[in-house]
Amino acid sequence: MSTDGESPEEPRWKAVASPKASTMPEKRGSAQAASGSWLQGFGHPSVYHAAFVIFLEFFAWGLLTTPMLTVLHETFPQHTFLMNGLIQGVKGLLSFLSAPLIGALSDVWGRKPFLLGTVFFTCFPIPLMRINPWWYFGMISVSGVFSVTFSVIFAYVADFTQEHERSTAYGWVSATFAASLVSSPAIGTYLSANYGDSLVVLVATLVALLDICFILIAVPESLSEKIRPASWGAQISWKQADPFASLKKVGKDSTVLLICITVFLSYLPEAGQYSSFFLYLRQVIGFGSVKIVAFIAMVGILSIVAQTVFLSKLMRSLGNKNTVLLGLGFQMLQLAWYGFGSQAWMMWAAGTVAAMSSITFPAVSALISRNAESDQQGVAQGIVTGIRGLCNGLGPALYGFIFYMFHVELSELGPKLNSDDDPLQGAFIPGPPFLFGACIVLMSFLVALFIPEYRKTSGVQKHNNSTSGSLSTPPERGSDEDIEPLLQDSSIWELSFEEPGNQCTEL
């Protein structure tokens, strides 16, 4: 049926986030009013709200790409990447321990308070970079307790989208993350070169404050009062605070267990790659600051295309599971290419493959969301984010240790290409950690082969028969969702990119 209320000038994919394209309870407005005016925000919850929050947070950190390398090297001149791995390891461990609790609390108390808390504490260390580097790195480690913005954001999006819409919505959110990295490192590098690192830190701090103000003023609460299992005054069981108890629950569901193992084995090398790759490009391959910024921008732009244009098409044509497998295949290829590559053009070519591998995370997030009830989205995404947080700690330490074992310290900021004392000159494997990472992703690929393509019927029927199920799954489509992969309905692609004058939404 046609959506007469939507402006022709508005893009079609807004219907994914609009309550007109979802089965939103009519009493959402009154529920928000009952929760307090500060929860209301502007308009209805939408992908726009989630994407803007993610964009500002990672834009602020993207500005610090160049200053971060400088401060890290100056603070830890010896064994730089081993120390970086230790710092990130503490942060990742704390994220792993806290993510399930924050997800469970957001299922009870709503998403907005925890969006505000996660962004505030994640960005809190930024101004300390120029005040006291030791406090800065110490606070980065401690901030891992709240570094779970993605899990809250994905639970936020799941509250107002139908199952077959979520991977598209998740793709847009993930693409926004990539978009924030397209320009922010270049801007940060320019400001650092011309005005000094202090101005970069100041700008990043202001962007973080803008993000906090946006959440406080503009972001509406997405979780209806009717779906919350408890009230603000209810106590939370300590079992919900135990991440290992959450993992035990995961072990009871073979599908979720396989997904979590896939996430761990795929994100472990990815986290290590993110922590060391830019210095690797600079020191071993010989990239200067301008080339590194251009490389980040290229991969970011291609990632946006992959997560918006290609992800939707792949989900419709291949299904959820096969899209995950394809993303893992791209990840294996790009890591192997980085491992064997020794020329600059090889890095650029592998970067295009790396951009295509970015479809894995939104596809996996949609898969885990599909296997969770509507009142357990925060817990489900929290478990996945906790595993990713653990990888954020183990990955950098693993890569730093492998570089150390191969006598590559990467502790200097200047490029060492063609240097006589470079141990990698003439080496058969210039990047050992990346090749090792490709082997780990191969294991992830083999595990993902055993993930069932479709959701369990019993779980969906229970979901449809519950009162909370009406938030995300319309009763008239309940039986159809049991046998459809995400985004199998071709109308979702039409929602995203059909000409504005020919808008038609099929419900």
Swiss-Prot record:
Top-level taxon in the UniProt lineage: Eukaryota
Keywords in alphabetical order: Glycoprotein, Membrane, Transmembrane, Transmembrane helix, Transport
Extracellular compartment segments: 1-51, 106-113, 158-170, 220-257, 305-323, 369-389, 452-507
Chief subcellular location: membrane
Matches recorded under InterPro entries: MFS (IPR011701), MFS_dom (IPR020846), MFS_trans_sf (IPR036259), Sugar_transporter_CS (IPR005829), Tet-R_TetA/multi-R_MdtG-like (IPR001958)
GO annotation, cellular component aspect: membrane
Polar residues: bias regions: 459-473
Membrane-spanning intervals of the chain: 52-72, 85-105, 114-134, 137-157, 171-191, 199-219, 258-278, 284-304, 324-344, 348-368, 390-410, 431-451
Annotated region described as Disordered, given as residue ranges: 1-27, 459-483
Subcellular location: Membrane
GO molecular function, one term: transmembrane transporter activity
Ranges of the Cytoplasmic topological domain: 73-84, 135-136, 192-198, 279-283, 345-347, 411-430
UniProt membrane topology term: Multi-pass membrane protein
Glycosylation positions in this chain: 464-465
Stored PANTHER family: HIPPOCAMPUS ABUNDANT TRANSCRIPT-LIKE PROTEIN 1, MAJOR FACILITATOR SUPERFAMILY DOMAIN-CONTAINING PROTEIN 10
Family stated for the protein in its record: Belongs to the major facilitator superfamily.
Name of protein: Hippocampus abundant transcript-like protein 1
Organism: Mus musculus (Mouse)
Gene: Mfsd14b
